[in-house]
Amino acid sequence: MLSNLPVIFLMGPTAAGKTALAISLCEHLNTEIISVDSALVYKGMDIGTAKPDASELARAPHHLIDLLDPSETYSVADFRRDAIIKIDEFHQQGKVPVLVGGTMLYFKALIDGLSPLPEANVEIRAELEAQAAQYGWPHLYQELVKIDPQAAQKMSENDSQRINRALEVYKLTGKTMTELQKQKQPVLPYTFHQFAIAPTQRSELHQRIEKRFKIMLEQGFENEVSTLYLRKDLHPNMPSIRCVGYRQMWDYLAGEIDHDEMVFRGIAATRQLAKRQLTWLRSWPDVTWLTTGDEENLHRVVSSLS
């Protein structure tokens, strides 16, 4: 059992080189990787998510990948629960857990905890949607302004998903979203060593994203998505199909866009994802930045543990 319970975070935008560094780190520390990626949890979605291949998995076992069928959903709370179980297992074995990925909300949930919000309720959602169909979302928004003005301030009067959720929470608990979000879980007893990796130039990251998307196409990404498309039980509003690249390929297979447009949109969506990830990281407290391709990266991470 490790005394100060160290946990390494290796965060960064998509295509920044996280996996390569993480595998080197695992070989050096004789440990394993916990994936922090909302797309890698899905089975049968390997190429478009850049899931580690067999040789990479042999060098460094990855956990929290291939957990679910693409028809299922995986919440932030599911991740937090599963990650804590794995972290504690590693600590019991005397290993330093290495958490790697770009789903920043998952990392945040580990550090800050989650509010005790209730599960979605189908009946209440349907009731609210029926009211919205009759009176419009701006009418329901005004209701929310009276109940929870602070939550309402953070959304527009046509943000149906968030208005619905805020009113649903109030109907289920009698408490506002704002009240419940202040009730966080206890802080975890770990020492977090937090690193973010990215190229210094945005143009380099864009080149890496474009190159990777084209490699995915060569590896058979179209066939991978076609298999999902032909199942008929999946649709583009599911979290799995909303993953970057999959949604654009889905639209192409549905005949809504041509091949060139699919490639253009796929690369553009991946760039947007990387931009959002970097925005999170620039305001992230206690993070040490690493430059993609720097030979000193491994040494910097390892030396932080001593």
Swiss-Prot record:
One GO term (biological process): tRNA modification
Annotated positions for site Interaction with substrate tRNA: T103, R125
Keywords, ordered alphabetically: ATP-binding, Magnesium, Nucleotide-binding, Transferase, tRNA processing
ATP-binding is among the record's keywords: yes
Ranges where the record places region Interaction with substrate tRNA: 37-40, 161-165, 242-247
Molecular function via GO: ATP binding; tRNA dimethylallyltransferase activity
Cofactor(s), by name: Mg(2+)
Residues that coordinate or bind substrate: T14, A15, A16, G17, K18, T19
InterPro entries named among the record's database cross-references: Dimethylallyltransferase, IPT, P-loop_NTPase
EC number: 2.5.1.75
Family affiliation: Belongs to the IPP transferase family.
Subunit structure and binding partners: Monomer.
Designated name of the protein: tRNA dimethylallyltransferase
Lineage, uppermost ranks: Bacteria, Pseudomonadati, Pseudomonadota, Gammaproteobacteria, Alteromonadales
Chain's gene name: miaA
